[in-house]
């Protein structure tokens, strides 16, 4: 394969994996450990 194709595939995989990790952190199991600053400072 050409170098440009490999670089494009590599960057695409990086973007997809980062997006998947961000969604897992936001909505998956680790989301229970996230704190909500708006709930901590109710008036």
UniProtKB/Swiss-Prot annotation:
GO cellular component: chloroplast thylakoid membrane
Location relative to the cell: Plastid, Chloroplast thylakoid membrane
Domain of life, per lineage: Eukaryota
InterPro entries: PSII_PsbN
Membrane topology field: Single-pass membrane protein
Signal peptide: none
Residue spans crossing the bilayer: 7-27
Function: May play a role in photosystem I and II biogenesis.
Family recorded in the similarity comment: Belongs to the PsbN family.
Protein name: Protein PsbN
Organism, as annotated: Psilotum nudum
Taxonomic lineage: Eukaryota, Viridiplantae, Streptophyta, Embryophyta, Tracheophyta
């Amino acid at each position: 394969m050409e170098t440009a194709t490999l670089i494009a595939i590599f960057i695409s995989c990086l973007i997809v994996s980062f997006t998947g990790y961000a969604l897992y952190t936001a909505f998956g199991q680790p989301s229970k450990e996230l704190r909500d600053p708006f709930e901590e400072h109710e008036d």
